[in-house]
């Protein structure tokens, strides 16, 4: 029976013609100082070869449309399974991605609000929950008799039919930042005081502005309120102007429509077709919470269904820990005949949610934008998704999954890895955290130094073998009898003797308003 991968002659980056056997169906930790070749072995050899060979089995037509890893610099790799890498720095998701969409918890929640909620009739009355929604039958309002179809889960999605029409489901709108239109009021309009006219509009707009009755040869700060209003908000009137070309003595006459400074930016934004064009415009813009949806991204109709007294957007504002408790109360709140369906939907939600809570993400709300999540938070989302897929025979390469993880949540991380092994997979774990590495079934230590001083295996075996190995650098730290002592710490006011940084902040994401000295 094949029970190990065989790597022969690995020369990726700083690896020194490395030969190593790596157990299959085990948690294999790779330790070592930064730059010792840990990731070169895990990602540059094992993942690169595992993913490349899997893709090589596909047709040429299919492979053309997929990104493939280059062949690793290695003489031979035998018995490597198809590989997936959960990288240290997952890509930053787009503006439409949230914690709820990234974990797919929002799919289950939308299904709850579609199938199990009280829906509003066209006349504003709420109908009690009914199985007619799941049967795709019309609901009949008991108060006014109006017949209507309840919204589907798709109609409650802000990336689809449930999007707010004002912000198109992003939760924010871009408006003109008036403070950027005239950055230096000591300049006159002739000297280029109105910034959008210099970069987004024809220079002729200065001449048109003069025809609108605005003085263009005095400092902008000396203009009257009426003149300033014409610059910022004046009407689109056509004016007859005389102009002189900059590079010649020729002059001419022209009828030209006046574009005020604000409309100049709005017009340019509407015509943006690429990133280069957006960069020219975005310096005049600011982002604000959408006034229509209040940042929820949902249309008014998508916010209408009520389940346990609240709407979908309010459920998405709850932290995951609070939401799990709320979902537990959904089935008992419904009529008896609806509870089997409710239990099924809620169970699929709870299974994923509890895994994320085990990984220490219970403080996040489903409406939190993915772009604001830390690297460690996004990587743990990847981990939870990997376990949910219930694959077998796959090599999972985890690159420092303990980043940002509190010691109290290490148990959840280890539980995820145990589940992957239990499903018949193999796990390669690159990490520095001794608490995580100590749970490995097999440990490979790279070193002894970084760069050209690394790339060799200085110790390998079980954790107990590494602890006994005198050549191991990490062995003493894995032992409970670690003879190494920590640096002496300062106490009291002596810490701030050489000065301090004062930090004061308002509320942002999970941070409450606070003040502290560092």
Positions of predicted regions on the chain:
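Conserved catalytic segment of ABC-fold P-loop ATPases
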Residues: 419, 426, 438-445
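Walker B catalytic motif
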Residues: 369, 398-401
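Conserved beta-strand-loop-alpha-helix hinge in the C-terminal portion
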Residues: 100, 445-479
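P-loop/Walker A nucleotide phosphate-binding surfaces of NTP-dependent enzymes
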Residues: 2-372, 378-394, 406, 416, ...
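Conserved hydrophobic alpha-helix in the ABC-type ATPase nucleotide-binding domain
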Residues: 412-413
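H-loop/switch region of ABC-family ATPase nucleotide-binding domains
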Residues: 430-432
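Long, charged amphipathic helices and adjacent flexible linkers at domain junctions
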Residues: 473-503
